[in-house]
UniProtKB/Swiss-Prot annotation:
Keywords: Nucleus, Transcription, Transcription regulation. This is PWWP domain-containing protein 2A. Residues 399-412 have a biased composition (Basic and acidic residues). The gene is pwwp2a. Residues 684-744 form the PWWP domain. It comes from the Eukaryota. It comes from Xenopus laevis (African clawed frog). Residues 433-442 have a biased composition (Polar residues). GO terms for molecular function: chromatin binding; histone H3K36me3 reader activity. It is found in: Nucleus. GO terms for biological process: chromatin remodeling; eye development; head development; neural crest cell differentiation; neural crest cell migration. GO terms for cellular component: chromocenter; nucleus. It holds the Pfam family PWWP. Its main location: nucleus. Residues 1-29, 399-443, 468-570, 609-655 are annotated as: Disordered.
Length: 784
């Protein structure tokens, strides 16, 4: 390396002699082709002191004596000898030792880095790292010297190393004389050397080592802080896991390593006699290359150094572990997302009806299916009747005879219907059953009709129409009396001047038979079923009105429409054998295959506003008749509906008793809490598990509780209206189908379900926690 004292600028070669005659009291700055540094010469231009600075730092260091020649980056400055040289800051390169005033220099370095001041630098093609060293003189002043840490050479040989023996530094030694120069080839890793302790700085020791004509200085750092010297790989010391090992084993390992290295060094130092000096020099060069080989970037087992330690050491190899793999969290793919969407769709139940409404819907569907076939049969029957049969008017007359012969005969009393044979003018006799069986039939009929949800407004309209028709029938009675064939009853009405009787109510119980009303049919209609099985065609014709018959054609001789309560029995039917064939054919041609029963309604008032009229055979009219009969007005079905007010007082009392016994009263009440048959207490606001067919157990909240009882106190049902969590729908369920939420959580909760199910469970759990006993007591404090 060419270190020229006070190197002049371009074109100033003649001034080199003048620069060489500088006085000892003057410090000079010169050019050094190395890293961006500034070279400082001592008074004798022998020692080079590396010091990188900017113009501001140079002014702080001391007064500028002169500015020598040069331009651009080759400007050379001079500073006074008496200035404090250690205050000059080091910018980019941080050597292990920076002089005596270590702390003050470090503070100025940090300040200079933050200010980002422009600096005057000297560039070099291939930078060479430098290490500062301090040489103590006999006391005149402190001198600094520069030592290269690595060997570098140029192709043209323009640069020379400070290791060159031509560079005389003997005058920097002690006052006794110069130190004999010798190389470092004799030093090997693991050998023991004697160093001088210069400074003690917290966890570091500044030491210097003299070897021949060379002086080395460095810092020994405390390894307990988990980091080593700058850029020097740890070879002698064990790995960083030494804390877990005992101290004795570490010392033994280090001793064994030293012994091995000493043996190797002895073999290398004592070459055989036949080895030439050229081979010795080559081996020395190989050893030097091994010692100066740059350490690897990473070391297995080395700790992570502190961040500031890394920041202060640029372009150097620092012992640190290999880079760790960055663990990136993988995005979780929810496999059950599509199922959660399906659950959201399924959350609106396909069957939101309770059991009672579900049965009604099923019955309506069955009727709709029958509409197509029944309507087709009705049209065919009408067409055939119009071709073969003329218009038939039936005039119904009722006759009640007072029989005083005894109670036995009054019990046997029954109405006989005479139906004329259209071809021969003959008729058949049908006996009407007893009063109690008719009352049972009427009660069953009322129950069937009340089970259907019908429109009350339509019922009132039909009742008004029935009144008008009844008045018209009274006017046309005499004119049409002898025009058509008639239907006579053997018993006449005694009190012919009595008020208008209620219109007829036609019921077809076979059509509406289902699971619910089958049980109620058994006690009252056993004879009716037997008659249907025995002579089905005859009963069809005898009890069913023709489809072509108009409502206005129903007439009575004097008192308008008369009431008949009839029920068919197979033992009471008398049909001549010659008429059976015709009756069977007519029965087959009929529009309906069901039995039509005409039932009378006993009125408590003179008007017929509380009565219902069913006067057509078509299916649509039957539906309207259900709506007519489902009004909120009270109906009484006494067994003796055929009797007039002129009957005996004993029979009227019996009728009242029977009618009261046949009435079924049911009372419903909304309560805030109730006890289930299994002993559980359920309150309004409770969180429960509920189940609907096709869905899992789902959390719900009880909104209301309804208890239904008979008039004798017998419990009929306990029902709750619930709202589902995560859904706006509500449902009516029996209390027996509900289970407490918290008590049955483990058995009801399904871990596999996600989405809205989990959301509903979370909401229900929060609501259950908020439902404390105090809140529950407040909710059930008042009965509704």
């Amino acid at each position: 390396m060419a270190a020229v004292a006070a190197a002049p600028g371009p074109g100033e070669a003649g001034e080199s002699e003048q620069d060489s005659k500088t006085t000892p009291g003057e410090w000079r700055l010169g050019e050094l082709q190395c890293e961006p540094i500034v070279a400082v010469l001592d008074s004798e231009r022998q020692s080079l002191i590396r010091c990188e600075m900017d113009s501001d730092t140079l002014e702080k260091a001391g007064p500028v004596v002169e500015q020598l020649g040069g331009s651009g980056t080759d400007q050379v400055y001079g500073i006074d000898k008496n200035s404090d040289f250690e205050s000059v800051s080091v910018m980019d390169y941080k050597p292990p030792y920076r002089g005596i005033n270590q702390e003050r220099i470090a503070g100025e370095n940090k300040k200079a880095r933050h200010e980002q001041l422009p600096r005057h630098t000297f560039l070099q093609k291939e930078p060479t790292p430098m290490i500062l060293s301090e040489v103590r003189d006999s006391g005149v002043h402190t001198e600094m010297c520069l030592e290269e840490a690595t060997l570098s050479s140029n192709n043209d040989g323009s640069e020379t190393s400070l290791n060159d023996p031509d560079c005389d530094i003997g005058s920097m030694g002690t006052s006794e004389g110069s130190v004999v120069t010798s190389g470092i080839g004799s030093l090997i890793p693991g050998s023991e050397v004697q160093v001088t302790l210069d400074h003690i700085i917290q966890d570091a020791l500044v030491v210097s080592f003299c070897h021949g004509n060379r002086i080395f200085s460095g810092v020994l750092m405390d390894l307990s802080k988990r980091f080593g010297p700058h850029g020097i790989p740890v070879t002698v010391h064990p790995r960083r896991e030494y804390k877990n090992k005992p101290v004795e084993s570490i010392q033994e390992e280090s001793k064994s390593f030293h012994e091995e290295t000493l043996l190797k060094s002895e073999e290398n130092v004592t070459p055989p006699e036949d080895v030439t000096p050229i081979q010795q020099s080559e081996s020395c060069e190989i050893q030097n290359l091994w010692t100066t080989k740059p350490p690897p970037l990473f070391h297995e087992g080395a700790p992570y150094p502190p961040p500031l330690f890394i920041r202060d050491t640029y372009n150097q190899s620092i012992p640190q572990p290999p880079p760790r793999k960055i663990k990136r969290p993988k995005k979780k793919i929810y496999r059950e997302e599509p199922t959660s969407i399906i659950n959201a769709i399924k959350l609106r139940p396909r069957q939101v009806l309770c059991d009672k409404c579900k049965n009604n819907v099923v019955a309506d569907k069955k009727e709709i299916r029958k509409v197509a076939t029944d309507s087709y049969k009705t049209e065919e029957g009408k067409r055939r009747r119009h071709e073969t049969i003329t218009t038939v008017n039936k005039k119904l007359k009722t006759d009640h005879k007072v029989n005083g012969k005894g109670q036995h005969e009054s019990q046997k009393r029954a109405g006989v219907t005479k139906v004329p044979n259209l071809a021969h003018g003959r008729g058949k006799v049908v006996k009407v059953p007893s009063q109690t069986s008719a009352a049972k039939t009427q009660l069953h009929t009322k129950k069937v009709l009340q089970n259907k949800n019908m429109d009350h407004v339509k019922a009132r309209e039909v009742l008004k129409m029935a009144k008008e028709k009844a008045q018209k029938k009274q006017k046309v009675t005499t004119s049409s009396k002898n025009a058509h064939s008639k239907v006579h009853f053997t018993r006449r009405l005694q009190n012919s001047n009595s008020g208008t009787l209620p219109p007829r109510l036609r019921i077809k119980p076979q059509r509406y038979r289902n699971e619910e009303n089958d049980s109620s049919l058994k006690p009252g209609l056993e004879t009716l079923r037997s008659s249907k099985m025995g002579i089905k065609p005859q009963t069809r014709y005898s009890a069913t009105r023709s489809a072509g018959e108009a409502p206005s054609e129903i007439q009575s001789p004097s008192n308008g429409p008369e009431e008949v309560s009839s029920e068919i029995q197979d033992t009471n039917v008398c049909v001549p054998p010659e008429e059976q064939d015709l009756q069977q054919t007519l029965g087959k041609r009929g529009s309906k295959s069901n039995i039509t029963v005409y039932m009378a309604i006993n009125q408590k008032k003179a008007n017929s506003s509380s009565a219902s009229v069913c006067s057509s055979d078509s299916t649509d009219d039957m539906k309207s008749s259900h709506s007519e009969c489902s009004s909120t007005e009270n109906f009484d079905f006494p067994p003796g509906s055929m009797h007039t007010p002129s009957s005996s007082s004993a029979s009227s009392k019996e009728e009242k008793k029977l009618s009261n016994s046949l009435k079924i009263k049911m009372f419903s009440k909304n309560v805030s809490k109730c006890v289930t048959p299994d002993g559980r207490t359920i309150c309004v606001g409770d969180i429960v598990w509920a189940k609907i067919y096709g869905f899992p157990w789902w959390p719900a909240r009880i909104l209301a509780i309804t208890i239904s009882r008979k008039d004798n106190g017998l419990l009929i049902r306990q029902e709750a209206r619930i709202s589902w969590f995560g859904s706006p729908t509500t449902s009516f369920l029996a209390l027996s189908q509900l289970a407490p939420f918290l008590e049955n959580f483990q058995s009801r909760f399904n871990k596999k379900r996600k989405g809205l199910y989990r959301k509903a469970i979370t909401e229900a759990a929060k609501a259950a926690k908020q439902l404390t006993p105090e809140v529950r007591a407040l909710l059930t404090q008042f009965e509704t």
